[in-house]
């Protein structure tokens, strides 16, 4: 692939995630009815984000924990010039200890275990088993986009980085699928079809398959993204991302559909945004959304440093 296209998609992936995350905060935890009430004319800009008790914790144009944790992974790749699982775990823990705003309950419980930084995957397994192997939250898939930008061993690295906090095979499969999709877009200009994705899903957990089917054959509403009891389920987030991957005709169209669906909208839009950014490139992300990010220049520098590893 041409270097310019590769760089476009590299930047598109990371900015796509950050923009989706920052815009998704506008409707996070809202039902579809609440979204329609607070944003009767939709949303076009960070300045429109309502300032309630939850949202006012972030400045408009800031991203949340989804992108913070993804950047812990990116920073580790750059600092170590390789994948170092324990270094990533240390960065996660440091982020948590320095505020970790927006951190999910499951992620917190795993990282709060005493020897987390020396044996993170064991900590994740312990917490998962303590919860009777039921927990399959979206706290790992939300940060996995950058793993798709590695040149090789994408599936293996996505598995291992997922298991730093989320041990359930539904989480692991979600991460491998999203990272593989991004890798195929960025490095091969290739779209994975439904059979490809189901092939990956079946290696991890059969329960992933129905969500792949919904995303491929049905409307976005079929995924019930604002379901009050399970909006943070990894397979809802995966389904939303797959839906825009296969059906959205532009970055903007795809992101707004996800954001206006409510539920765990910042995470759904972060993952969907990374995939859409990888597909369409950074130039197709509306300029006001890119430049409106609070830390746009810092983000650009970080991506440049990561991209430089490929020279």
Located regions from the model:
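Structured, active/binding-site neighborhoods that engage oxygen-rich ligands
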Residues: 1-311
């Amino acid at each position: 692939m041409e270097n310019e296209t590769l760089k476009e998609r590299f930047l598109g992936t990371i900015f796509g995630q950050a923009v989706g995350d920052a815009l998704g905060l506008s409707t996070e935890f809202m039902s579809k009815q609440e979204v329609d009430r607070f944003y009767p004319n939709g949303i076009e800009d960070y300045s429109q984000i309502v300032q309630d008790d939850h949202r006012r914790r972030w400045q408009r144009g800031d991203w949340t924990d989804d992108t913070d944790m993804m950047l812990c992974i990116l920073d580790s790749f750059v600092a170590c010039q390789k994948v170092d699982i324990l270094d990533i775990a240390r960065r996660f823990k440091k982020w948590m200890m320095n505020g970790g705003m927006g951190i999910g309950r499951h992620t917190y419980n795993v990282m709060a275990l005493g020897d987390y930084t020396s044996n993170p995957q064991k900590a994740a397994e312990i917490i998962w088993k303590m919860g009777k192997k039921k927990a399959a939250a979206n706290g790992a898939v939300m940060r996995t986009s950058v793993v798709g930008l590695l040149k090789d061993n994408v599936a293996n690295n996505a598995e291992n980085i997922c298991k730093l906090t989320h041990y359930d095979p539904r989480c692991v499969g979600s991460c491998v699928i999203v990272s593989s999709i991004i890798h195929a877009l960025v490095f091969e200009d290739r779209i994975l079809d439904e059979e490809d994705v189901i092939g990956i899903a079946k290696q991890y957990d059969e329960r992933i398959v129905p969500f792949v089917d919904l995303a491929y054959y049905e409307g976005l509403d079929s995924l019930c993204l604002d379901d009050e009891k399970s909006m943070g389920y990894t397979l809802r987030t995966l389904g939303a991302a797959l839906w825009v991957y296969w059906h959205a005709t532009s970055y903007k169209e795809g992101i707004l559909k996800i954001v206006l669906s409510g539920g765990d909208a910042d995470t759904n839009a972060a993952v969907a945004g990374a995939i859409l950014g990888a597909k369409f490139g950074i130039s197709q992300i509306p300029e006001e959304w890119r430049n409106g990010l609070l830390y746009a220049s810092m983000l650009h520098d970080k991506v440049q440093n990561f991209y430089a590893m490929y020279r």
